[in-house]
Swiss-Prot record:
SUPFAM superfamilies: Amidase signature (AS) enzymes. It holds the Pfam family Amidase. This is Glutamyl-tRNA(Gln) amidotransferase subunit A. PROSITE patterns: AMIDASES. It comes from Prochlorococcus marinus (strain MIT 9303).
Length: 486
């Protein structure tokens, strides 16, 4: 059910907020023992919030735009009084004393929290397998991963456990799991949405965005969470347009660029490539003009990212020392030993690996060769995008080189895991808005996602193109049944 449809049913009294929340909680009880999308379910709070909405409606009060909409929140966004773990032993018992800006705005808009979702530890991963509390399964085939790091949110939306969810995207952590799970995932422009209350991974790359079952719902959620925030100095102080009204703008005259370097990748699955190109042709049939463009340094994004992101992570995660909060090792007889043991026991292997990479890249003898060089390449990647947007309105690529892979397939091969984000990372490095939406299925019945990238603050254009494609293609109304959780 779309948010607009739910709003109408609630207003007409066809379904109460409590009935919807009870339905969602029952769905979670049936499905989540298999999926493990949720770390915590806030059933008591959800029912109480739903009852308040029903009481307000009965009293004739006007309702906020997301009244009664059941949401899940990635567990690296702080929720006051509710455990926020980042799927790490380091924060297993951490209960924030404050609310993140994005969740605060959602509750003010009437949304109802169903619970907190699983993720790769501290958002570092592409499969949700690095969670300290167990992996999440893909609803389309439980032997496969849902993607990451926001795999819990993507899986929850795909399996109908919630109407929508929030995730965070540092190098593709919303878009890649959206592709793997057959849902819509939107990463806004860097600074379009506040990061206040998002537990930091890589501060110059992190951005919060929604998972939904359709593009219109993504526009509705972005409308609520976007906007300036004095508590986040990187948040842009620019007006928020009406994203929903932009959806129906005509496609005629829209120029869509196909990035040559993306379709020439050696690791690009043939079915993914052909399906995404069919999506491009569908957009052409709707009035868009297709143009081949070149972003010569697009493929350099992954090497650049795996210097910059771990460097920022090594600084951000230095605060977890076992002294003020977080996991503290027992039995250490000195402060240095306690800190070292707390980090060794509290952080998982992937987080430790990235801290080591980042610390090395920032060390005195290597900073110029690695970190500063990576920042220079980042600038060049941004310049390539700037040049492309001189001739086109939106860029089109596959979201991921492959469909969802088997659980454990890349467990012993970090490089193979990192390559899953090959096509999503450049948008983060350039701070651009990007969206993944379903465009078809492979021979195994697994979803394939197409990625659209727009220029800075051009979310309206991005959503417009995505909406027209979605309405014309009807991909998710014709999906194969396969192993999909009923």
């Amino acid at each position: 059910m779309a948010i607009a449809e739910w709003r109408q049913q609630l207003k007409l009294g066809e379904v109460s907020a409590r009935e919807l929340i009870d339905h969602q909680l029952a769905r979670i009880a049936v499905v989540d023992p298999t999926l493990h999308a949720f770390l915590d379910v806030t059933a008591e709070r959800a029912r109480a919030d739903a009852d308040r909405i029903d009481e307000a409606l009965a009293a004739g009060e006007s309702l906020p735009p997301l009244a009664g909409v059941p949401l899940a929140i990635k567990d690296n966004l702080c929720t006051k009084g509710i455990r926020t773990t980042c799927s790490s032993r380091m924060l297993e018992t951490f209960v924030p004393p404050y609310e993140s800006t994005v969740t605060e705005r959602l509750w003010q808009a009437g949304a109802v929290l169903l619970g907190k979702t699983n993720l790769d530890e501290f958002a570092m991963g592409s499969s949700t397998e690095t969670s300290a509390f167990g992996a999440t399964s893909n609803p389309w085939d439980i032997s496969r991963v849902p993607g990451g790091s926001s795999g819990g949110s993507a899986a929850a939306v795909a399996a109908g456990e919630c109407m929508a969810a929030l995730g965070s995207d540092t190098g593709g952590s919303i878009r890649q799991p959206a592709s793997f799970c057959g849902v819509v995932g939107l990463k806004p422009t860097y600074g379009r949405v506040s990061r206040w209350g998002l537990v930091a991974f890589a501060s110059s790359l992190d951005q919060v965005g929604p998972f939904t079952t359709n593009v219109a719902d993504a526009a509705e959620l972005l409308q609520v969470i976007a906007g300036s925030d004095p508590r986040d100095s990187t948040c842009l102080n620019v007006a928020v347009p009406d994203y929903c009204s932009a959806l129906s703008q005509p496609m005629s005259g829209v120029r869509i660029g196909l990035i040559r370097e993306c379709f020439d990748q050696n690791g690009l699955d043939a079915q993914v490539k052909s399906t995404v190109l069919e999506a491009a042709e569908k957009l052409q049939s709707l009035g868009a003009e297709l143009v081949e463009v070149s972003c010569p340094r697009f493929s350099d994004g992954i090497a650049t990212y795996y210097v910059i992101a771990p460097s920022e992570a090594s600084a951000n995660l230095a605060r977890y020392d076992g002294v003020k909060y977080g996991y503290r090792a027992e039995g250490a007889d000195a402060l240095a030993a306690m800190t070292a043991r707390s980090r060794a026991e509290g952080f998982g292997s992937e987080v430790q690996r990235r801290i080591l990479i980042g610390t090395y890249a920032l060390s005195a003898g290597y900073m110029d060769a690695y970190y500063k060089k990576a920042q220079q390449v980042r600038t060049l990647i941004r310049q390539d995008f700037d040049a492309a947007f001189q001739t086109v309105d939106v860029l089109l690529t596959p979201t991921s080189p492959t469909t969802a892979f088997q659980v454990g397939a890349h467990a012993d091969d970090p490089l193979a895991m990192y390559l899953a984000d090959l096509l999503t990372i450049p948008a983060n490095l350039a701070g651009l808005p990007a969206i993944s939406l379903p465009c078809g299925f492979d021979d195994d019945g697994l979803p394939i996602g197409v990625q659209l990238i727009a220029n800075v603050l051009e979310e309206s254009r991005l959503l417009q193109v995505a909406f027209h494609y979605e309405q014309s293609a009807n991909v998710m109304t014709n999906h194969p049944q396969g192993n999909f959780i009923p």
